[in-house]
Amino acid sequence: MIRAKHISNLSSTARSFFLNGSRTSVTDGNSCVYSDDENCVSKRQQLRKEAGQTEKRPSSILPKPSVVGCILPGEVTKPVVPKKVDDFGRPSLLPQHVSSSPALPLKSHSVNYASTVVREEVEGKASSEPIGDQIFKAGIVAVNFLSDLSNCKIPSYDGGSDAFGLPKSCMVDPTRPISSVKSSNVKAIRREHFAKIYPRSAAKESSVGTTRNPSSNFRGAKEAERTGFVKGFRQVSNSVVGKSLPTTNNTYGKRTSVLQRPHIDSNRFVPSGFSNSSVEMMKGPSGTALTSRQYCNSGHIVENVSSVLRRFRWGPAAEEALQNLGLRIDAYQANQVLKQMNDYGNALGFFYWLKRQPGFKHDGHTYTTMVGNLGRAKQFGAINKLLDEMVRDGCQPNTVTYNRLIHSYGRANYLNEAMNVFNQMQEAGCKPDRVTYCTLIDIHAKAGFLDIAMDMYQRMQAGGLSPDTFTYSVIINCLGKAGHLPAAHKLFCEMVDQGCTPNLVTYNIMMDLHAKARNYQNALKLYRDMQNAGFEPDKVTYSIVMEVLGHCGYLEEAEAVFTEMQQKNWIPDEPVYGLLVDLWGKAGNVEKAWQWYQAMLHAGLRPNVPTCNSLLSTFLRVNKIAEAYELLQNMLALGLRPSLQTYTLLLSCCTDGRSKLDMGFCGQLMASTGHPAHMFLLKMPAAGPDGENVRNHANNFLDLMHSEDRESKRGLVDAVVDFLHKSGQKEEAGSVWEVAAQKNVFPDALREKSCSYWLINLHVMSEGTAVTALSRTLAWFRKQMLASGTCPSRIDIVTGWGRRSRVTGTSMVRQAVEELLNIFGSPFFTESGNSGCFVGSGEPLNRWLLQSHVERMHLL
């Protein structure tokens, strides 16, 4: 699945919204959605730029589809011979130092295309002075200029002076428009101006087209014929390699090298008296423009202070080290230091230390940055105290401050508090901006409240804020994730018609939505449209394509995409390796999943929890309990804290245990995680006469898990209810389900399509959960009919293929639901051509719902 970490560069509220899969959590790092923040550039992307100054990093993995188990060709680097799964031990799971491999040779046919961007135009006659004399004079002027700089004598130039006395022919004519120079959001150079730079080698072509391994679970009959999707992908892939811009080892000028959010003019949102940070950066404490030496000193101070705060935890030692620096810090420098701090305790200590320094006074920027730091740590009590101090110091919160508060409450799933801040900012006279509305739209859509999200979209337009590319991307993702893909696609087309150009993030969102809906041809078409629009794939794009190929059964082609990604100078990170571990694991190929995990370690990467979860799921799927235990122990040894998904995997394995021994072993694994969910199950009380004690117990636990993302909570509740149902605790299962439904953990489980026309959606549930959910929902209908006399005109029960369906064409959920409905003689039937949907309507449905046994169906 696509994971949140793949696109963390834009925003944790608005850009990371399309990577929330079942293997990741939504919580991530710093947010940069605010109007006065700098553009976000990830650390990984900065490393890519630094790597560009040296030779290319060797490919750590070049898969050969025809040979299972050999994933590193000898001519590139030393082959990695992974241990068999049965033989691995704890040390092999830990990251080890791997010696660097020989660098790949530089491409000899790299193209210098600088002349195509800026052309020198000589007007009049060229200088008759010998070129040697010109160079000599220019050198003398340069030496004098550098001497002035060293003595802090900054020369000033008027419009007609030439700093170095260079001939005018070497400059671009300022009166002439330069068509080849465009903004960063527009493709600067047409592809057809260049020859093919990276022709696909014969070896690579043969690797993609090699006969597939018959042992793969995805092959079978599909091996005899290839769909148009794979052929189309090869065609697009070749066109990418053939038509891409020249890429050298020291050039990273590609459009997608650094992804940044759309620029928002912060001046529009800053009230009088609250200086803009971009303007303040060039001014000293007195408001005068900084000289060159002052500006350099400012950066020097920020670096020195940050270095001290990185070395010490806040305390007397840190204070003494700061005093020994003997530096005078102003509010701007303090703000820059606070932005670099991740530990809220250190940041808060430094903040109050500054407040005690003679002559120092915090401004609105430092207060706002500190609010953001506390918000990431969910320290809302400290935030309220800080806001009171901010007002007492004469700094009124502005739009950016309120946006940070809304984002902080939203990422912690405190939606009511976020809306309260939204109302308070308007009462205080701060007008919401696009960031405000987009944040509210995103957090409500992620929590399953699509109606509120769309209402905020309407309010944004009514407030005179027309949607831009950023806004459209948020809304499109919200609609798609809520199951309204046609509406999302319609909005995408509307966006283009309105002259709002989609960016790479928008294309990635649309491709991901179509891929999740198994519309692989549409995903491929969007991939082609994206390239025709001048965008090159980034790591997120490549991951989506790999996932699409993997789910279609073409895992070797997915590995070929991995190789192509490396050739385009994208360095694979943990989520990319984790995706391939996950794809091979779901295919049932434990050996290949293990090989990719080992390849990640040999690439010098440290495993993360989602990747370990993928490998853990692989072991559990084939009943390798001992290997799963070893992996879990190594996770703990690495300091990786098992997540909610980790516990969910173990609980599902325990539910499906083939023997009491397996179930006991899984129970030990669950206990070793130390997750609060285990104590929740151990302390589950026996249901009382009305089940209120179980509901209170479940309610307290879900409150504890409040800040977890909805997908993780949904997965755990599904596993818990399924476990309780299959272990005979059906009354408890029903009570837990009712609490989860009240807390909107399953927002799509029950929906009114139109007046008195209801839809019960069970297709994302396990069979035990589906039976419990259906029984309690039908009992709710009966209760409503008896209380108000309102009767449903039609009820559709959608089972689909079901969460636990292993083989195409069969659904355990459908079978369990059909059996339950038949036992109680229900009037539900399946319409022709749609065996996954049971329909009940009219008077027969109402008479059946009023029967007393409907109230106790879940106890069967």
Swiss-Prot record:
Residues 760-843 form the Smr domain. PPR repeats lie at residues 363-397, 398-432, 433-467, 468-502, 503-537, 538-572, 573-607, 608-642. Signal peptide: none annotated. It comes from the Eukaryota. InterPro entries: Pentatricopeptide_rpt, Smr_dom, Smr_dom_sf, TPR-like_helical_dom_sf. Belongs to the PPR family. P subfamily. This is Pentatricopeptide repeat-containing protein At1g18900. It comes from Arabidopsis thaliana (Mouse-ear cress).
